[in-house]
């Protein structure tokens, strides 16, 4: 399996598969601004309970205080919704993945889009990023170049799926 993920709720990533001279996976990470914007939008759906709006307008997951606020918001949200509903609400999942993936991805995300490549023997390492929803949240796009005679060089297959699939088969 080239992609190793299913249709996602939050972590849907556009993956392009095309013919290449060798197997190579290129992962495009979101910028910090993109990540913080997504989290701010998710937080807009919840009551502020007297929260300082300055924090919400200037949220940055890199700051420990902001992550602590996000953890509190997440804990409140999972208490407010029955178990099964908490697991399918996109805003709650987004916050969960952002928090759980932060430590793994903080050095891979930059002010601008960051790109990492896995070539040849390292090719399959991309699956660890695309199959884990906590990491996949931080991905913007994936491009997979596959060596093969049967692939037309003018053909590109696009797939939009995610690691948090309800049916990863």
Feature-to-residue mapping (PLM):
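Globular "head" domains of long coiled-coil molecular machines
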Residues: 1-169
């Amino acid at each position: 399996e080239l992609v190793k993920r299913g249709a996602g709720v939050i972590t849907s990533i556009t993956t392009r598969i095309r013919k290449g001279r060798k197997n190579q996976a290129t992962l495009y990470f979101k910028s910090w601004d993109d990540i913080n914007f997504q989290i701010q939008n998710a937080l807009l759906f919840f009551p502020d309970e007297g929260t300082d709006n300055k924090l919400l307008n200037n949220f940055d997951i890199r700051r420990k205080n902001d992550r602590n606020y996000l953890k509190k918001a997440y804990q409140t949200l999972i208490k407010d919704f029955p178990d099964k509903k908490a697991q399918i609400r996109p805003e709650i999942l987004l916050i969960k993945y952002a928090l759980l993936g932060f430590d793994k991805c903080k050095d891979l995300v930059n002010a601008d889009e960051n790109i990492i490549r896995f070539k040849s023997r390292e090719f399959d390492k991309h699956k660890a990023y695309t199959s884990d929803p906590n990491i996949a949240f931080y991905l913007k796009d994936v491009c997979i170049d596959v060596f093969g005679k049967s692939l037309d060089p003018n053909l590109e297959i696009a797939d939009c799926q995610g690691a948090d699939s309800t049916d990863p088969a």
